[in-house]
């Protein structure tokens, strides 16, 4: 992805949702994303993150420490939206469920129910419910706050919910639009 590619995609959007880790900071294209935020203060940039608790509280420090572009800072963002502890637990800290959050959600659900239960000690129905409670947070927040695009590295888990919420999803690692439903 080039900066020109990014500008072409984001020029059609006034309100943009940004993931933090592996996107705005410590990511392959973080320099491009930071530059875009700095170059476009006229847009409404929102941070939408799975950070919660102490990680959310240290967000400003992490943005500062991982700043690549001069002028990049938390003051450029219209809003910061972190997930609740309860919803975070549903996707990332389930002790009875060892499913890696990077697994493809749709593929995991193709496992026969009895095998799924034996492997993960949780029913597919409960897994699907927990997955929705956690991973629909970003697309739902984007829709509620008027963001028409989400830039995120965790596209496998976000795709389904972005489609449901009519939010375009840009893969922050590969630079590709993952769903093409939105017509700006």
Descriptions of predicted regions:
Residues 46-48, 148-152, 169:
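Short, hydrophobic beta-strand segments that form beta-sheet elements in well-ordered domains
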Residues 159-184:
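Acidic, PIN/NYN-like endoribonuclease modules and their adjacent C-terminal/linker elements
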Residues 1-117:
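Alpha-helical substrate-recognition element adjacent to the catalytic core
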Residues 53-59, 156-160, 177-178:
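Short, charged/polar "capping" segments at the starts of alpha-helices
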Residues 38-41, 142-145, 162:
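Short, conserved loop/helix-junction motifs that constitute active-site signature segments
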